[in-house]
């Protein structure tokens, strides 16, 4: 109803009443769009359904429970994406809670095709095609294949880091606790040792962010360092997370 599109979508906030639309302190926060305008949690949540099947190989679960939910999310994103040059992009788009310095020299949070958005969609569309093939269902395969082939590639920024946004904008908060642009490394599986250049770009991005953050952010960073085969760094973050506080 909010977007006038088919399928379903959820944002950063879910509650016991099933409300999943954008929620923010509009008129109070300086920039509520930086956290509320994020229609990508449905894509992330679908990943857990796919992982459940990968571990259990439960075809009944895949067909009866996972597929209908995942297909609904896919339908929404097929309608949400739009052509921009040679690519299909998301918009409005954010890298949750972080901001960038625009060409006008001002701080902004809303752009298009953030790296996190595209990473989530590449994974979602990828395993949707696998599900269709496994179940022998045509579904939205043709449109998904067409759009997937035109999603923007990962790009590196001026510091050798994975870009956070579609264009090489400088972030206004280098040490922001979120590492949304590294979703493709973890929890995703888009960036692996088969892509050494992208792995190094992830390392640079993670080093620029630093180790500080809230509890869940430290846990995410520990997982990212583990994916980068740096167990000592991951262990250091876990020890820091489990220390006594006063």
Where are these regions (language model features)?
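Active-site core of glycosidic bond-cleaving carbohydrate-active enzymes
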Residues: 1-2, 8-9, 27, 33-59, ...
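Acidic/histidine-rich catalytic neighborhood
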Residues: 72-131
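Generic preference for hydrophobic/aromatic residues in regular secondary structure cores
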Residues: 7-19, 81, 112, 162-166
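Acidic/His metal-coordination segments adjacent to aromatic residues that form catalytic metal sites
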Residues: 14-37, 93-113, 244-246
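Structured mid-domain segments that build the active-site/substrate or prosthetic-cofactor binding neighborhood
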Residues: 48-51, 70, 75-80, 186
């Amino acid at each position: 109803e909010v977007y006038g599109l088919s399928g379903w979508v959820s944002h950063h906030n879910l509650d016991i009443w099933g409300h999943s639309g954008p929620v923010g302190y509009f008129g109070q926060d300086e920039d509520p769009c930086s956290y509320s305008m994020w229609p990508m949690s449905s894509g992330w949540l679908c990943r857990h359904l796919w992982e459940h099947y990968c571990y259990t190989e439960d075809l009944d679960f895949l067909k009866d429970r996972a597929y209908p939910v995942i297909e609904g999310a896919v339908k929404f994103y097929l309608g949400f994406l739009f052509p921009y040059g040679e690519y299909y992009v998301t918009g409005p788009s954010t890298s949750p809670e972080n901001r960038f310095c625009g060409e006008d020299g001002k701080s902004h949070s809303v752009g298009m095709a953030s790296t996190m958005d595209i990473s989530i969609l590449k994974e979602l569309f990828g395993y949707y095609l696998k599900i269709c093939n496994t179940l022998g269902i045509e579904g939205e395969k043709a449109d998904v294949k067409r759009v997937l082939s035109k999603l923007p590639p990962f790009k590196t920024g001026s510091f050798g880091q994975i870009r956070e946004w579609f264009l090489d904008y400088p972030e206004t908060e280098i040490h922001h606790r979120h590492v949304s642009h590294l979703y493709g490394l973890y929890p995703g599986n888009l960036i692996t040792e088969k892509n050494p250049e992208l792995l190094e770009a992830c390392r640079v991005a993670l080093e620029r962010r630093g180790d500080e953050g809230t509890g869940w952010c430290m846990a995410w960073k520990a997982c990212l360092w583990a994916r980068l085969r740096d167990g000592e760094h991951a262990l250091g973050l876990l020890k820091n997370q489990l220390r006594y506080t006063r």
